[in-house]
Curated annotation (Swiss-Prot):
This protein's encoding gene: hspH
Any one of the GO CC terms: cytosol
Protein known as: Heat shock protein 88
Originating species: Dictyostelium discoideum (Social amoeba)
Keyword Calcium annotated: no
Biased composition (Basic and acidic residues): 735-772
Amino acid sequence: MSFVVGFDFGTKNCTIAVAQKGGVDVIANEVSNRLTPSMVSFGEKERYLGESALTNQLRNIRNTITNIKRFIGQEFKTDTVQEELKHEMFQSYEMDNGFVGYNVTYAGEQCSFSSEAILGMLFGKLKKTTEAFVNNPVRDVVISVPVFWNDYQRRAILNAGSIAGLNIIRLINETTATALSYGIYKEWSETDPTNVLFVDVGDSATSVSAVQYKKGQLKVLGTASNPNIGSRVFDETLVKHFAKEFQTKYKINVFENKKALIRLRQACEKVKKILSSNNEAPVSIDSLMDDKDVKGMIDRATFEELANDDMNTIVEPLQRLLSELQMTPDQFQSIEITGGGTRSTSLQKKLSEVLGRDLSKTINSEESVCRGAALQCAMLSPVFRVRPFAVNDVASYPVSVHFKSVSGVEQKLDLFNLKSAIPTPKPLRISFPVTKAEGFEIVVNSTFGTIATVKVDNIPAFTNKSSIKAKVWLDIHGIFHIDEVKLVEQIPEEETAAPAETPAETPANGEAAKPAEEKKVKVKETSLVFTTSRKGLTNELLKAAIEEEGRMQASDLLAIETAEKKNALESYIYDMRSKLQSSLKEYVTPADAETFMTQLNKQMDWLESEEGEDQTKSVYAGKLEELRRLGNPIQKRKQDLEDYPDAVQTLKNIASYVKNEAMIPGERYDHIEKEEKEKLCKDCDDAVEWIDALVAKQQATPKTQPCIINTTEVLAKKTQLEVTAKMILGKPKPKPVEVPKEEPKDTPMESKDAPAEEPVATKDQKMDDILD
């Protein structure tokens, strides 16, 4: 069975939803959490992904990559990236392509990774979590992205998916995914559209989307966002508040200690959640810094005062969207809030004040996006039948093209705006007139920079009116494409010689002669050879990243298996040392027990030594096998001696039952030969005699010796008796022989009216009459 999956890739956490015939399930990870941390950490032997990365973060700060979403597809020198890096603990650098890269220590070596490679590792973890849940390989997936993401970021996600071995069949905007999961199950009018406003406050960004519903479809009317502010600003506000308080009260500066700062941030995040349902919240951290335990308290009123400016910034996209659409809150049937940030009661209060109406909280703030992504995946999958529901989304960024020839001729053309549909229903044909056979460039631009540059070195010579044409479109991911660059020449068709005209009389009606027909034009198209350059990973770098990911996965698997073997060896030693003093004590001689215990202690000492701390999988496996050669015979003796009484009793029960069946008097088995029944009874007696002799011999044997009775052999004897009994006692009775009836002979002297003689009843007939 094919499974379709939706990933919600968040700044702090990821969620996974799987669409199956029974519906959409949000699945839990290996520690039963439905939220998987968006973290990747590098250790001495293996990588730690998701939950394990979070566990190792404080012990491995410099090699733990967090907030991956804030850097993927972002150029290193942008103000946004530089501001983000001020708060991070890991080492980053500018790659040759201008994007963000990471420097880490992995397996004792200095390694560098692109953002796509890091995200590919996280996606690989989500893929394995999903496969563990469905117990099948998973490949097709829809991944959510912020509605404001540009071309660079979207293509980076596709590359990360390729590195993870995923087939991303669509990148869906987060607010659109929420709108889909909200609307697909509801009944909408076919004629009267219904407007719903979605407010999504995430950890690091805020987005608002106005959606119109009609029967079988949704249409995004418009969106607005602030990419740089989300609920984490409340965490930072609380961090600054308590850092100042602790500096005054305890004389410590948490900003000077990275571990202390991380612990304080984690504590402040809990405070923020507590204040959502309580009027005050405490902070208590043991040994935060300089062996000092710290405590603090804050109430909701103080928090709202501190965070007031941040809340005003968060609601700004909402106000901006309503202004752009020239709509009022009353024109929406419902205003749905989603995202982890909307849990804050204070923020809800602020949103309600700005809108002048109540908010709706019917959406699961943490799972609506991944559910919508999984539904979209099911809708696009050929193996699922889903209720017809069209998703009409809009572009996330404007696109324009700039034509520049070698001689300096320039032309500009706007192609897509924020209201353009994605995917583009039909590719657009753009055209630029040319007058010279010379090379040119088509530069595709947007607000964030250059998307692509198409370059043609030269074009064929032409003599007629000509132009350059190209096909452009936005695909289902919201990514721009340009293709089929052609030279289009308009060639007038040659006129054929007209026959000599003879003088003709002017028509009587005085009509003038018809004017000559316009010359026909023939269009000649010539495909041009062009190169397209884009920012981001090249095909060579992507291929290398895929190969490197495969090697690292193999290394991770080996490290995990090695750790499992080491743990198995340690567990076996502890287990056997305990059992030799208890449950196995009576099954081993004192001398053998001492020898075994000596070996167990020796291996434990080796494990705890520097040599045993770091060994290969085969070494641990060999040590474990050596100990099992000593311990397995003891455990087998105990198991055999415990198992054989049940097997013996089972054999005796079967023998007794079969013998009693064979000796039942009466008609039940009277069709079976006496000799056969006697032989069956003898087989039963022989089996009992055989097992009694073995039991007597076993009872005279010490428990420290191997068990004489083979349980498997006893059960085989029982099965043999059952088969023999079935063959003999299961024979069907022969069918009674039918006596043919004699036809009555006609007697001339017999009168037809004479009464027929009643037949004399046989013994069986009389019995039948009685039974009736």
